């Protein structure tokens, strides 16, 4: 297969109006539209460049002969829901958790799943090596709008949990939408669930003034403090496009995405008497332990929600997700879904009648460390090859090269993988003690440093 030149793990992400210009976006959209030749939905997150890019991709799609349905500014999973149910494809303008200067284009097929490699290569071939279809004047597409999708998405989310039971509990919830697209959904869903809601950063703003879009612990100190000050049952945080949720327990503890995944996995397997769970090679051993206990089967893919989603579809999987808090409920949407995650977590709190900290404490215990190190994109492949060679030649550790280099030791593992959207390597480690996890992650970083210079 030819090497892709534009698409990364999550579509195309670049600095807005630098590399990701209107001209670039329009031609790429025209290339995509030339293949789809149908009705394409578009929408995006709250970034300052999103309206500019939406207009550009609209022009490109119309030029190729596609009709366009503009869904507005809304969460990525709401757009995926709309495409899966009504349209032939979609383009989502988002850079998810990346800093404000970035934006991106995420292309999805008629199921709302990120397009497979062969289609992305076909789009790139049209973009670079030939010309997109340019419709004759009487075949140019038409623009429509659909402003009802958010309400429909919220209603469909609520259908999938026991609303009355959650309402009866009157949970006290603090939600931090990070000024992103979740601002249009999360507060309303929580109110429909009868929660006493306190909002932080729930005014949409593409400059993300309250915090960085990535919901990692250093960025959520205001949320943590508010949960403790108010005596809330739970704190919730979204990334920029609201396709993932991070939880804070009632004591103000940051709950790793793996733990949230494990909680929901356990509940889903209990409710369905087992099933296929799809995750990535970077996910905790706890996911495997729970599957074994509750009749599940785990399938691992490379990192990327579209890979997990496609495997869920191909295997008729029950549930899936990633370690970053992006959980996929395939009977609803083939992609990470912050709103559905929130609703399900609240339902678990109510059904189990236990605080979040206690539910987390009941899960299998592993310790993790997550580090990252800068590395130019053009060196990444060479660095990975040299790391793999060193491990093979100097140790007897097991290697998994599904995505990057995963080194499996008797007391844990470390995965060293290149980011698909940034010039960095991420090193995730897990072990039976925090000290060992820290050591393994630092070792992974040292291997990258050794071979990038």
Regions found by a protein language model. Name each.
Residues 234, 272-453:
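Phosphate-binding and adjacent anionic-ligand microenvironments
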Residues 107-110, 246-250, 328-330:
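Short beta-strand-to-turn element immediately C-terminal to the catalytic PLP-Schiff-base lysine
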Residues 2, 15, 103-230:
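Gly/Ser/Thr-enriched, mixed-charge loops and adjacent short helices
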């Amino acid at each position: 297969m030819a090497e892709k030149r534009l698409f990364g793990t999550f579509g195309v992400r670049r600095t807005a109006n630098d590399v990701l210009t209107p001209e670039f976006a329009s031609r790429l959209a025209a290339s995509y539209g030339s293949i789809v030749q149908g009705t394409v939905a578009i929408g995006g997150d709250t970034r300052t460049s999103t309206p500019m890019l939406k207009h550009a991709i609209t022009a490109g799609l119309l030029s190729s002969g596609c009709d366009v349905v503009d869904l507005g500014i809304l969460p990525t999973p709401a757009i995926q829901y709309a495409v899966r149910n009504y349209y032939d494809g979609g383009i989502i303008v988002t850079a998810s958790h990346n800093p404000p200067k970035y934006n991106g284009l995420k292309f999805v097929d008629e199921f709302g799943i990120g397009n497979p490699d062969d289609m992305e290569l076909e789009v790139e071939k049209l973009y670079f090596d030939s010309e997109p279809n340019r419709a004759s004047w009487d075949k140019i597409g038409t623009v429509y709008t659909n402003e009802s999708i958010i309400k429909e998405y919220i209603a469909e989310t609520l259908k999938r949990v026991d609303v009355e039971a959650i309402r009866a509990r009157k949970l006290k919830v603090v939600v931090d939408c990070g000024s992103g697209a979740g601002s249009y959904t999360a507060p309303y869903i929580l109110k429909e669930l009868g929660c006493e809601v306190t909002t932080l950063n729930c005014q949409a703003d593409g400059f993300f003034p309250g915090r960085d879009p990535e919901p990692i612990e250093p960025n959520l100190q205001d949320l943590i403090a508010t949960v403790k000050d108010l005596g809330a049952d739970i704190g919730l945080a979204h990334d920029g496009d609201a396709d993932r949720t991070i939880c804070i327990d009632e004591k103000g503890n940051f709950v790793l995405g793996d733990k949230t995944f494990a909680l929901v996995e356990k509940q889903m397997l209990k409710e369905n008497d087992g099933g296929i769970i799809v995750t990535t090679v970077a996910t905790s051993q706890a996911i495997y332990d729970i599957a074994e206990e509750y009749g599940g089967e785990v399938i691992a893919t490379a990192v990327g929600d579209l890979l997990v989603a496609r495997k869920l579809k191909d295997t008729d999987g029950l549930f899936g997700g990633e370690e970053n808090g992006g959980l996929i409920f395939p009977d609803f949407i083939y992609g990470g879904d912050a709103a559905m995650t929130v609703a399900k977590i609240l339902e678990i709190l109510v059904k189990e009648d236990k605080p979040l900290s206690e539910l987390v404490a009941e899960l299998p215990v592993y310790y993790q460390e997550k580090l990252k190190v800068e590395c130019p994109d053009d060196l990444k492949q060479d660095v990975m090859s040299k790391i793999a060679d060193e491990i093979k030649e100097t140790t007897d550790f097991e290697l998994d090269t599904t995505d990057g280099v995963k080194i499996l030791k008797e007391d844990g593992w470390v995965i060293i993988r290149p980011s698909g959207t940034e010039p960095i390597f991420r090193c995730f480690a897990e072990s039976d003690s925090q000290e060992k996890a820290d050591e393994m992650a630092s070792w992974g970083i040292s291997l990258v440093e050794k071979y990038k210079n």
